Amino acid sequence: TLVLEIFRQDHALKMSLFEQGELALTLRHYSQTSVSFIEIDKLCQEVVSLLNKVNKKITAGQDLIASLTKVGQLLWDNLLTRPVKNRLKSSSILDLILSIDEELINIPWELLYDGTSFLALNFNLGRVVRTKEEISLPQYRSFSPTPKMLILANPTNDLKSAYLEGINIRNQFDRKRNNVHIDFKSTSIDKLYVKKHFCEYDIVHFAGHCEYDPVSPENSGWVLSDGRFSVEDILNMGSTISLPILVFSNACHWAKATPGLIDLDYQQKNYNLASAFLFSGVRHYLGAIRRI
């Protein structure tokens, strides 16, 4: 596995790319590049605009891909140093961990374009975020011999597609019933049910609505039949018991006025929910950026 560490220092980025086994080395090379973060912010906004054109079906096919590659190429050119670019392009390793400061989470690193492909298509890519928040060491869960998976689908009973998604996942895993135990719950899912059963499972898949509270972000969370399963609820649970190893949250910020569109600050909104799970002991979090 490759690890790309990137630190923000004023108007520059300092970075180092190394194999995970090299963590114990006494010395490690790093390189630095000056960055105009005003320009980077504009490019990030352009990425969101392009993705929203897909959702609104304004632009499709090759025109959109061409525009996205241009923006991705500019991000690649302006964010990474030459040594890092060269090693990424020549590496035969397929797994890449991106370790970044939380100030850099709004950048769509996965869409950096190296001239031939996007970073997320070249690597199995994951993020590790460094935070200034003081956190206690969470209780990490070990995988059971036969992992248990909970599917929570359409808890508010107004998303047929979320229900069908849950059914499809259950049916797919049904073929492997000797290897993984699946429980499926749909409609009328309340907060008490989730709090009681969430920590019994190794994997949780949620398909439904999520609401973001800009005034009190700790109240943001999954929308259930009787309210939100919030960031605060997650943090409270994580202080007493081990949470699932993997949470797949196929939910995004519900907005009736502009359904299907992506907010300019979508990375930050997703980070609030993701960080709550990760701080509480969830090892892996997958989340959607598109409104549902």
What are these regions (language model features)?
Residues F123-P147, P155-N157, I203-I292:
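Catalytic cores of nucleophile-dependent amide-cleaving enzymes
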Residues T1-A207, P214-S216:
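Domain-scale, conserved, charged regions that form catalytic cores
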